[in-house]
A protein has these predicted regions:
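C-terminal catalytic domains of large/alpha subunits in multi-subunit enzymes
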Residues: 1-247
Length: 247
């Protein structure tokens, strides 16, 4: 979601850059070097960060040594605070192409194939993004043809009891087979995001219901404007359509 990779990641990246800047400045004072002439590297043997003069690793200090010396010299703590609230909020996008099959005898809707395109800028973790888009489609499909909250029209209170019998959830056998779900990521770059990234969570679910409903319309020629499109709803609509054609 945007609040994660974009807001949280952006804040972390900004803090890391500021702390690095402070580290190099303090290290320069301790090592009698200009901050711009130092570099921050990873000491793989010691498993810790180190500031050194490029080309002269013998003239270096660990991050821990620099931080301790800064405190001992009363130069303050090397730290920085930033807000998760970012100055920008770039939109993310998804597009769904859905193939459905409608059994006109039972009203059951199945999805043989799905193609999803997602735009989250530079994907920080492509596998995680694809997994989120896949999972979000399954949730959206469930919203479209299965899940329904029944409320009291007068009080607004829920009439369901929280049982699987009164709040239908699709099982894995009713979900689209993951092998038939193709997910592609657009190669874009968000200049205000960390390393060009932006969120995807908000858009991952947004167009699923419309795509499935449009595919159902293309299959049986009936528009549905209320969800869920359950088998009972499909059969009633088909019966009404058949009656209208005979009249």
């Amino acid at each position: 979601a945007t609040r994660g990779v974009y807001c949280g990641g952006g804040a972390v990246l900004n803090v890391a850059r500021k702390v690095k800047e402070m580290l190099l400045e303090v290290a320069g004072r301790l090592m009698d070097e200009h901050a711009c002439d130092l570099e921050l590297v990873l000491d793989e043997e010691a498993h810790q960060g180190r500031v050194q003069v490029p080309g002269y690793p013998q003239k270096s200090m660990t991050i821990g040594q620099i931080a301790k010396q800064a405190q001992n010299n009363s130069w303050g703590t090397i730290s920085y605070i930033d807000s998760y609230r970012q100055k920008n909020c770039p939109p993310c996008f998804t597009t769904h192409f859905v193939e459905v099959e409608v059994d006109t005898e039972t009203g059951i809707i199945t999805v043989p194939r799905v193609l999803i395109y997602g735009d989250c800028g530079v994907a920080m973790n492509p596998d995680l993004v694809k997994g989120q888009l896949t999972g979000s489609f399954n949730r959206g499909f469930a919203y479209t043809v299965y899940e329904k909250l029944i409320t009291d029209e007068k009080t607004g209170a829920l009439k369901i009891k929280g049982l699987i019998s009164d709040y239908k959830l699709p099982s894995t056998t009713e979900m689209p087979y993951v092998g038939n779900m193709q997910v592609e990521l657009c190669h874009t770059y968000e200049p205000t995001g960390p390393y060009g990234a932006k969120g995807i969570g908000e858009a991952a679910l947004a167009s699923v219901q419309a795509a499935v409903a449009n595919a159902i319309y293309n299959a049986i020629g009936i528009r549905f404007y209320k969800l869920p499109i359950t088998p009972e709803v499909v059969l009633a609509a088909l019966k009404e359509k058949e009656g209208a054609s005979h009249s």
